[in-house]
Amino acid sequence: FEDIVITAHRALLRAGENVLAIHGLNRAPGDDDFLITAELTGEGILDLAPRYFQSPTPGEANEADGFAGFVADTSFSVDRGFYSEPFEVEIRSETEGAVIRYTFDGSEPGPAAGSIYDGPLLIQGTTTLRAMAFLEGMVPTNIDTHTYIFPDDIVVQDAAATIARGFPRNWGGTSADYGMDPDVIGQGGRDRFGGRYAETIRDDLLAIPTISVVMNIDEMFGSRGIYTNSGSRGRAWERRSSIEL
């Protein structure tokens, strides 16, 4: 049997009676075997409510499951930026009944990943807050990312603490270089400049543009990471990330 899709010719159908004509041929003039039968299979729209589908199927039946709509995007009560005092952040979605999940470690929240939001979140230091909202039967939101930077944390960060949080010791064949340079802003004026820049470093950080890049550590600094292989080019080296200015 052979299935022939005639959807492309549906415009030829007319209201009322239509005739299906079939031309059948034997395989050879002397072939006594001949069988031909036709069956028409059509699908109608039973549910007139509009639905949204993840994959397009032009000219063919839609997927079995669809979405009734989109979950309203998440909003944060405090915007990303520089801060010096602790504060609380509220996350909302205008979609009634939506569940919000969030993370503090830079990982992506998902239907089964991250913590369920149930009230204001306390931010006491440099934090990357990511959130996503879900509701069954609807398209979830994208991931929103807000990075809150406390300069007091930045000026004292060092290599040991960074490595302890899971960052690699080496970038390929090069030793990793994390943290602030103690030769420039050593504590108590113990640096090459007698504390000159240590006194102004907090204001200096606020005076220049800052970019926050949030992504998987291995995809940034691992053996196939884009920082480790900074000379590589092309789509094969693109990585999923969130960037904030």
What are these regions (language model features)?
Residues 13-14, 21-44:
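Disulfide-stabilized, aromatic/cysteine-rich ligand-recognition loop
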Residues 33-37, 42-245:
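Short, compositionally stereotyped local motifs that mark structural "simplifiers"
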Residues 7-11, 118-120:
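Beta-strand-rich interaction surfaces with strong enrichment in secreted/lumenal proteins
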